[in-house]
């Protein structure tokens, strides 16, 4: 599970914005269906089913969608057994890093959910300055081909309290 998308996205947008009008426009762009529904008092979630080269991914995605629909009571079926808390990983997106110059490069071909250790070299700025992980966590949405002054990657922290607040 990953939470914290909109706040982290908004922090990056605010940092890059030139004026209030641009900020408002770009923040509206970041508000998708889930955030809009929540803002109006509704219930919403985003179910990421992945898009990768795993040949089982279509079945995994179908099962995830059907399990969610059954669990929410939207279709008939047997409610899936809950995943024990100790078997799941919950993360909070906490910071987005920008590619500052076209010459900024990653240390290696990162993939979403790769683990990073505090102090680990993630990349190198065009001027040779190392880009180091400021804390241990996981990298999300690494974009090696990002343009200058746009999102380059996000970092997450573990969120051990996720889902336990009401249980």
Predicted segments, located by residue:
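Structured catalytic-domain cores with a bias toward divalent-metal coordination
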Residues: 1-167
